Amino acid sequence: MINFNTKEKMNMTDKLKSGERLPEITVPRLGGGTLTLGTPVDDHDWQMVVVYRGKHCPICKTYLAELERVAPEFATAGVGVVAVSGDPEDRARSFTDEIGVSFPVGYDLTVDQMRMLGLYVSEPRSEKETDRPFAEPGVFVINAEGLLQVVDISNAPFARPDLAGLAKALKFIRDNDYPIRGRLAA
């Protein structure tokens, strides 16, 4: 097993909370420029940030292909979509080119940035998988006020929100001024 000697470990209480602002995180964007997570890059006033594990993950390939398929439903709901991973540019580019995504994709998310997002971070099982720690999946929906409307993180690749259902739910939330849920302190 690769040991990356990560000194600071995230506590379970370091997770982002609904109703908070997404930390300001800027990463390089495929195609040039940068991508600031939580800041819409198109004519939508909401943004959904999908954090994927990386090129080594076959489930991520299926998930991003599904995101590409349902991206128009998110657009109808007024939500722009972006994806980001800790992969370097070459791996992110070959992965997304293989899938054929049209939405913005960021890369080189650092371990510190992953922690700022409250994500679970894993070490690769071998160098064949990848050469660096990577984020486990996360989905963040940021509303027009810049607040986290929806927060969904997982510690494994197998549990992720259904994208078609989420697009319909976000349309309902917007059409009905549905409040941010899960704000009561435990």
Model-derived segments and their meaning:
Residues 2-186:
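Chalcogenol-based redox active-site neighborhoods
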